[in-house]
Amino acid sequence: EKFMAKESWDRAIPLLEEALRRKRKPCMIGMGAMTDPYIPLEEELCHTRQALELIEKYGFGATLITKSARVLRDLDLLKRINRQAKCVVQMTLTTYDEALCRKIEPGVSTTKERFEALKILRDAGIPTVVWLCPILPFVNDTEENINGILDDCAEAKVKGIICFGMGLTLREGNREYF
C-alpha cells in the first residue's frame, strides 16, 4: 500500500537525482524491468521523461523495456542520450496477430504500432531489441506467428531478439490450463 501511495511516486525523481549525482562512474540505467515506463498515466505524470532528463544531465546511458509506442514522445531525449553515452530501447512482442494482441495484451500498443515505433527508433539511430515472449502453448506458438514476428524484426533491423520459454513443456496441470 505504501509503495502505491502517490507520495512515494512523487519522491522518485528527487531520489533518482540524488543517486545519479553520487555515482562516481556513469553506467546504463535500466527502466521497465518491473513495470512499463510508458503506462497511460505517464502522459500525465511525465516521470519517465523527467528520469530521462536526469540520465542525460548526469551523462548516463539508458535502456528501456516497453510495450508502448509512447516511447516516441521522448525520442529527442533518447537521441541525445544515445549520442553522449548509449541508449537502447527494448520492445516486448507477443503475437503477430493484431486481434489476438488486443485480447491477450489489452491496454498496450498493438504489435503494428510497436513495429512502427521500432522503425522510427532505428531511423533515429537508437539501437532496438525485441523480447519475443511469452510464447504460450496453443495461443501464440504457431509457426505463422513466430515467422511473422521474425520477419518484422528483420524489416525493422533490430539489433537482437531475446526469447525464452520456447522449450515449454506441458507438465500435469499446465496442459489443462492452456
Residue map of PLM features:
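A short secondary-structure junction signal
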Residues: 43, 101-104, 141-144, 148
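Surface-exposed cleft-lining segments at the edges of enzyme active sites
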Residues: 99-107, 133-138
